[in-house]
Amino acid sequence: MSPSMLTGNSPRGCRLPSISSTTCGRQLEKVPEKRDSGMTEVERTYSANCSDFLESKGCFANTTPSGKSVSSSSSVETGPSVSEPPGLPRVSAYVDTTADLDRKLSFSHSDHSSEMSLPEVQKDKYPEEFSLLKLQTKDGHRPEWTFYPRFSSNIHTYHVGKQCFFNGVFLGNKRSLSERTVDKCFGRKKYDIDPRNGIPKLTPGDNPYMYPEQSKGFHKAGSMLPPVNFSIVPYEKKFDTFIPLEPLPQIPNLPFWVKEKANSLKNEIQEVEELDNWQPAVPLMHMLHLSGALDFPRQS
């Protein structure tokens, strides 16, 4: 084998035909140019992060004329039993890596409209919240929900909710003039309920305890409510400060059987006294003759 048949960056034991180096270089130059034509700033950042990750794992990077680094996997010698067969496996590794990058970039470009405003680091920690962002409208141009998650807590925060723009006008907080609300039908408590329940105010201090400061000069009247006076004679305060020197006698409280025996004795005495005014009952036949109940009609 001539020295030109050995590749400069390949490890020992890896031999490729001389045409593979030029062919691989041309393919790598064509593929990134085709991809870079439609790349945005987010996709370029993503490809740079992927290349850094592959370089940290021990892969080599080939620099294209457009200034972008395309990562390429390299074979690692694990022992004498593992060897890379001659042919084009290295070229297929280049093509597979490039195809994976194209697939990832196309996927990120499709979801770019709904996920561009959110940080990329939080996707692994909160997968449920990011799944809500994939809900698109029928046209697929704008997200159906406006969603601003709070990553510091478990609360899902919706800024506006569902999109409510009709012909460029937000109608989410508009009310119809024909709408009959509860306030219009029944009123509100603070306007329709009287705290005094219709009782007129008599004195400056005569006001409800909930709003004492609303009456002018309420503190000048002394007490909040004047003493109640139901008579013409002016009220005189009586001092009830008598302290007895001996215990007061207990109020007699007789049991029930004693009271019942006294009542029965009183009834017997009253019945005996009524015997002095006793009169015999009127005969029944006499009562019938007087009433005319025994007069039969005569037969002719």
Swiss-Prot record:
The modification Phosphoserine is found at residue 113. InterPro entries: SASRP1. It comes from the Eukaryota. Keywords: Phosphoprotein. Signal peptide: none annotated. This is Spermatogenesis-associated serine-rich protein 1. Residues 1-10 have a biased composition (Polar residues). Residues 27-42 have a biased composition (Basic and acidic residues). Pfam families: SASRP1.
